Amino acid sequence: MKTKTYRFVCLVASVLTLQLMNGSSAATPPPPPNSKNSSTSCNRTCGGISIPFPFGIGGKDCYLNGWYEVVCNATTSGSSGTTVPFLSRINREVVNISLPEGNNEQYGVVHIKGPVTSLGCSSNTSQVPQKSLPDLNVTGKGSPYFITDENRLVAVGCGTKALMTDIESEILGCESSCKDSKSSQEVTNLLCDGYKCCQARIPVERPQAVGVNIESSGGDGCKVAFLSSKRYSPSNVTIPEQFHAGGYVVVELGWYFATTDSRFRNPLGCINLTYSGSYLSGDSCLCEYGYFSEMSYRNCYCSLGFTGNPYLRGGCIDNDDCKGPNICEEGTCVNVPGGYRCDPKPKIIKPAKPLVLQGVLLGLMGLLFLVVGTLGLIIFIKKRRRIISSRKFFKRNGGLLLKQQLTTTNDGNVDMSRLFSSEELKKATDNFSVKRVLGKGSQGTVYKGMMVDGKIIAVKRSKVVDEDKLEKFINEIILLSQINHRNIVKLIGCCLETEVPILVYEYIPNGDMFKRLHDESDDYAMTWEVRLRIAIEIAGALTYMHSAASFPIYHRDIKTTNILLDEKYGAKVSDFGTSRSVTIDQTHLTTMVAGTFGYMDPEYFLSSQYTDKSDVYSFGVVLVELITGEKPLSRIRSEEGRGLATHFLEAMKENRVIDIIDIRIKEESKLDQLMAVAKLARKCLSRKGIKRPNMREASLELERIRSSPEDLEAHIENDDEEDQVMEISRE
């Protein structure tokens, strides 16, 4: 509640008149400060905070007197070049400055940073209260400041007793407790009612100095007390540590435009104040004149319909009141100084109706038929073009080649009725929105989609196809049509009538294994048991491709990014863009080298002959990733061991493989079991393909490792001397 502004009654006006008449011969009334200079040549912002006159930064013409001087200092924290404003006379950082606004706010407001008094919050055990800043004191000759009743004394913590000091009239305070009971102190903030927090009002006489003292009334822990503005009160006031760490709170100071000379006749911006203290009407601003603490003061504010700074000449600017909605419902709004008026709208005389409308109606009907016919023709042409384009794209995207492959394939299982239209897939993927992207690969981009029936799908949109890549796309369709295995991604259908070919797969929700292994932000860390199961499932899928499918299929790009994980973290082998099938009697393929560095078989790289053992080598790298949790290529490792396979083989050779085991599984895994898998990985990474096991042997070995841990040591001891690994205990 703000204090009323007292105005002069006749007796006070008479006394002032006598004083002015007696003093007119002795002294000349002082001129008003140069408000013009203060507005044109002075900096009016500091650190993003507006500094309105009578406050100012710079020379003496920029502010009324020393009480209103603001210094713009560089801050010691935060980003370089940041500045903060300080009130020079009281040496406090300014948070906000506002001018009086009409009759409802009869003084201006300055928000400053105030101190926090704490007890038991620092590392030392001293029970002496600590203050982040000195107590607030705005006293002094000519001081226009006072502490408003918008502030509250607040105590936070268990058993915290806070008292206001430096107030002569009374002793005020409050006490908080951790017992769930209501405080007897009158409060208005229901979040601070005595439980862990209490508050007390500031006395209404507007003191200029208030100190805060804190005492412990029982209980340990951090306790704080402070004076704070209700406007800047935090939402959670039950945690004392956050106030102690912050080091300050915001305090509201009221200020008057004060002067000690009652002969100060004219205000800075308003010229309507009379000699006796009353004011005239009709100007852009108003001023009030009275007494407070035996000091004459004057507050000015812009009149209704004006905004700005009344302490500057011409500082109050007329508002355009006609910008508001529905100002004049039945007329035209005209802005006038300080308000607006509503002028009646001119009457509109409607033209007389034509006597003959037949010609106009006939013309409109003819135009309508012409428009309808034109639109129908345009629709027909567009539909025809779409059909031609669809046929063209179907042919260009390998539709004819696909039909030819299907007719020459002994066991083709592709259901040609599962061809999707482009409109279906656009609707399912929100027109292939970037928000739907699941991943990008060498062959194209994969989107998440949802069909009309609610089924979730993965849509692989190939890159712009040229003749060289067309065979790879058709090859992937043919290969996936021949595969029926629970650990291999299932092909649902395809779309060939778009500019770029599209494949539709079953949706695998948990993404690829590479991200789950190497993304540190992933909350789920795969256990050794899960990793071993994934390895067995991958081995089973590759065994099926190599020996159980209609034709042996070599994947040619086995890596963790091409291994997806379903909702139960089951493995699904994907991305068959570079895969090749061979006849039963073929032992290898001679092709251009394709694959991913870090996973590529060195024997294949040198000879360009890809065999089933090349897939085994890539599988060995995946096993090492599961064991170590490291990436296949890393700049962190030495130049010689930058590749994970080389790094792992050196560790096996030096009997220190235990040192490179993933720390996330090191403690919970069975060491004998893990070492047996490491030995299998070493065999898969043999430089010569003939020394590597085939995928069926690797799959059976992994099954044996999981199901028969008692036989592991015997198998390890029976290895060749070259591959032997010493037993390494956790100790």
From Swiss-Prot:
Residues 27-360 are extracellular. Keywords: ATP-binding, Disulfide bond, Glycoprotein, Kinase, Membrane, Nucleotide-binding, Phosphoprotein, Serine/threonine-protein kinase, Signal, Transferase, Transmembrane, Transmembrane helix. It comes from the Eukaryota. GO terms for cellular component: membrane. It is a single-pass type I membrane protein. The modification Phosphotyrosine is found at Y505, Y604. Serine/threonine-protein kinase that may function as a signaling receptor of extracellular matrix component. May be involved in plant's response to pathogen infection. This is Wall-associated receptor kinase-like 5. ATP binds at L438, G439, K440, G441, S442, Q443, G444, T445, V446, K460. Pfam families: GUB_WAK_bind, Pkinase, WAK. It is found in: Membrane. Residues 1-26 form the signal peptide. It comes from Arabidopsis thaliana (Mouse-ear cress). One of its GO terms (biological process) is cell surface receptor signaling pathway. Induction: Induced by INA and wounding. Residues 382-731 are cytoplasmic. Residues 432-705 form the Protein kinase domain. The lineage of its organism: Eukaryota, Viridiplantae, Streptophyta, Embryophyta, Tracheophyta. Residues 709-731 are annotated as: Disordered.
